[in-house]
Amino acid sequence: MKKTLALMLSLTLGAGLLSGCVSTRPTTATGDVEGSSSPTQESSASGGVVNVYNWGEYIDESVLEDFTAQTGIKVNYQMYDSNETMYSKLAGGGAEYAVIIPSDYMIARLIEEDMLEPLNFDNIPNFSDVDPELKNPEYDPENLYSVPYMWGLMGVIYNTTAVDETDLGSWDLLWNEKYADDILMIDNSRDAIGIALKSLGYSYNTTDEAQITEAVDLLIQQKPLVQAYVMDEIFGKLEGGNAYVGTYYYGDYLTMLENNPDLGFYIPEEGTNIYVDAMCIPKGAANKENAEAFINFMCSTEAGLKNCEEIWYSTPLLSVREALDPEVSSDPYAYPTADILAKCESYAGLPQNILDLYDSEWTRLKSAT
């Protein structure tokens, strides 16, 4: 991590922890984010090709060049803005990707629907550096299909010059009429409905249809206060002071903080989502060995450290964490303490009838006036 950011963390994190998990220091969205090239099955002259489909703002692109230089394998890289966008592309058969990086709950769904290839870990020896705490997870119990890429927490980001300290601490800030038209809400169904569920005291993973409907009713009440529903658009709006309150991922908050030191972050008292994004290979993907070579490379200490220091997310690699600046590796939001973890809940896979309900309720929210 850049030294300037590490210094800002050391100056501000302590004050945030004193105020109860307050630090002042990717969902159905619009579609693909433009990437470097379209998927292809053509081979380069040197070592073939690997088509990678990842979230926006979620890689140090120089590591792609490093991978090609080391292996001779060309990377065709495209981005998406939500798990649901990625799923729709795969389910529609519209593209041939060799590596995808979905979140935990989406991995569970892809496994259940037989949409992933089992990995050959003989080709991924660097898997040994993955933190044992992140191996054999609930979403992939035997680690047959996935290798952790990054992980982290979701929380509330706010402008410290515009938001009163007495209003902090809860998800309720996103419903505070004082900040009408300065609130940004995340633009995907699982996260937005999940936030409303948590604010009501329910589980992210409830299958109680009445609770889900109640959560969407709460989002409809919030809608007049919302300036915009956003994904990566949140960067420009919060960095530029064009909105004062939003919810996003801690790694992205650290990126925003470099550009606007007036931003703060906290974990709501009701609890939040802890997630893992992992590298997988879609069923029937071309160039599977190239895909496994890419996954193995991303788990190397050199590539992992370079990537982590660029995008700020929490690394699953033990050697990388050891190499980070101590101010970063001891950051309790990047590498949560037990009291913070006690407030966290992972997303689980949901049955199809509940997924259908999410879709219809999300449409109800978006069409509400």
Question: Whereabouts are the PLM-identified features?
Answer:
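A ligand-binding cleft/hinge motif common to bilobed small-molecule-binding domains
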Residues: 106-109, 245-262
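Early extracytoplasmic/lumenal segment of secretory-pathway proteins
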Residues: 22, 31-35, 42-109, 236
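Mature extracytoplasmic/periplasmic domains
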Residues: 282-342
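Conserved C-terminal helix/tail region of periplasmic/extracytoplasmic solute-binding proteins
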Residues: 338-369
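Extracytoplasmic ligand-binding site segments that recognize negatively charged/polar headgroups
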Residues: 53, 95-97, 101-242
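Short, low-complexity disordered leader/linker segments with a strong preference
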Residues: 1-49, 368-369
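Short, hydrophobic alpha-helical packing/hinge segments within bilobed ligand-binding/sensory domains
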Residues: 86-87, 107, 171, 234-237, ...
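Periplasmic-binding protein-like
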Residues: 213-221, 259-283
